[in-house]
Regions:
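N-terminal transition regions in large eukaryotic proteins
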Residues: 1-154, 174, 183-194, 205-208, ...
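Eukaryotic alpha-helical solenoid repeat scaffolds
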Residues: 199-200, 207, 211-223
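Short, conserved phosphate-binding/catalytic loop or strand-edge motifs used
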Residues: 165-171
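Alpha-helix N-cap and coil->helix boundary residues
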Residues: 66, 164-165, 195, 199
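Amphipathic alpha-helical interaction segments
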Residues: 70, 168, 199-203
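Tandem alpha-helical RNA-recognition repeat domains
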Residues: 171-178
Length: 223
C-alpha cells in the first residue's frame, strides 16, 4: 500500500525493518486493547458500570483507533445528550445547523476545506491540472462532510464563527469518526456517512466549548 494505516502517504522509513517491527508490535497491542474496549463499551449503556479508575486509566493510554468513533462521543462529559443539556444545546440538531442560511464565513471555509490534509487518501481530490477543486463530482466525500461540519459550527457559535485552523481540528475528528475504520468488535457501529459527520460534530463542539478545553477562545476575533 502507498498509504499508512491512517491514510497518509508512506515515507521511506515505512519499508525498513525497524518500521515493520514497530508496526507488528503496535498491531499486537492494539488487538489486546481492542478487546478490552469491546468488553467495556456497551452498545446501549455506554460506559455505565465501568469503574471510574479503570476508565481513566484506559482513556489516558489512548482510545484504540477502531473505537474512537464510538467512544469519543460517549466520553465527552459522559455522552452527547448530557453535554448538549449542560451546554444549553438540547433542542439543537446537527441537521438543522447544516441547513442554516449561508453566512459570511462560507467563502473562507470553501478555501480551507480543499487545503485540509491534501495528501490524505480520504481528502485527496484529483483534477486535471493537479490542483484541488471545491464542489463537483470529483470532490472527495470527506471534503463535502468537512464543509458541512464547519458551516454547522459557524451557525451554532456565531460569536466565534469560523477561523482558519479549525478545519484541521474538525478534519482530524472526521478521520477518527470514519465508519470504515471502526473496530470489527463494535456491535453498534453504523456505516452511515451522515452519522459519521454528527459523531464528529458534537466532539468538535465539546472540544471548542467545553469548560476544560475552551479551544474556541483561540479562534475568537478578540484573540
Amino acid at each position: 500500500s502507498t498509504t499508512d494505516a491512517w491514510g497518509f502517504p508512506q515515507g521511506a522509513w515505512h519499508g525498513t525493518g525497524e518500521a515493520v517491527k514497530f508496526q507488528q508490535t503496535t498491531e499486537e497491542k492494539d488487538a489486546e486493547r481492542d478487546l478490552k474496549w469491546a468488553r467495556m463499551l456497551h452498545p446501549t449503556k455506554g460506559f455505565s458500570g465501568v469503574p471510574t479508575a479503570v476508565l481513566k486509566r484506559r482513556w489516558r493510554k489512548g482510545v484504540p483507533r477502531g473505537w474512537r468513533r464510538a467512544a469519543w462521543p460517549e466520553l465527552m462529559d459522559h455522552g452527547p445528550a448530557e453535554f448538549k443539556t449542560a451546554a444549553g444545546l438540547r433542542q439543537i440538531t446537527y441537521q438543522s445547523l447544516v441547513n442554516s442560511p449561508p453566512s459570511s464565513y462560507d467563502e473562507v471555509i470553501e478555501k480551507d476545506v480543499v487545503r485540509t490534509f491534501p495528501r490524505h487518501a480520504r481528502f485527496a481530490t484529483a483534477v486535471a491540472d493537479g490542483g484541488r477543486s471545491a464542489g463537483g463530482d470529483d470532490e472527495a466525500a470527506a471534503i463535502s462532510s468537512l464543509r458541512r461540519i464547519l458551516r454547522a459550527y459557524a451557525a451554532l457559535d456565531k460569536e466565534c464563527g469560523y477561523c482558519q485552523g479549525m478545519n484541521y481540528v474538525a478534519g482530524l475528528l472526521l478521520l477518527a469518526c470514519d465508519s470504515a475504520s471502526r473496530s470489527p468488535n463494535d456491535p453498534c457501529a453504523s456505516s452511515d456517512a451522515a452519522d459519521d459527520e454528527e459523531r464528529c460534530f458534537w466532539p468538535l463542539v465539546a472540544t471548542a466549548r467545553g469548560p476544560r478545553t475552551r479551544l474556541r477562545d483561540l479562534y475568537l476575533p478578540s484573540m
